[in-house]
Amino acid sequence: MIFKKLIPLFIFFTILFASGGYDHGTSAGKGSWDISVTWNPFNYFEQGQSYAIFGYGLTERLDIHGYYSYTHRWNDNYYGGFSYQFYESNKIDLSTAIGIRKYRNEPTTHIFFPQLLYTLRLSDRIGIGGSLVDIRNQDLQISKGVAKDVFLTVKIFENKKYKVNFNLGGFQPIFWEPKTGQWYPTYSVGIKVR
């Protein structure tokens, strides 16, 4: 009974304080939502951003997915596309995806293709996820480079309706260079709603 009252409060604070990327190879599943939210509190982190990532299962293996990213440099961008989970086992899930990214304040369009997204299950509670994303110009002729992310995920709560994970990892961008080396540290809280 107390969990029913705490879940909405937990989800509210998760949305407020989550930060980081959350690409993985497991489909949301038909009729389910995967949501990850980032918040760069008061633009504290110079290279940080606030964004929301979503995935919705059209079928057991096909998702519509996307994100909206707010940057304090006033060049927000957004992405929409489809992902397809082509492999599933007890230990690993693999997906591919295609999508389009646009910027609000410039005419640049990028195609994210091909993409390889993966989930490795180390146990019932712990896994590794991430992605390799080839970012191309809009006519697909020129690759701008391959963005990478990898994270450790820990399941912190699950019931019939919700699943909540904490994720800690890194992101290797191609259009900017992190001040701390090649990888930018990330964290997020992912929520699955069935």
Q: What residue ranges belong to the model's regions?
A:
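N-terminal secretory signal peptides that target proteins for export/translocation
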Residues: 1-2
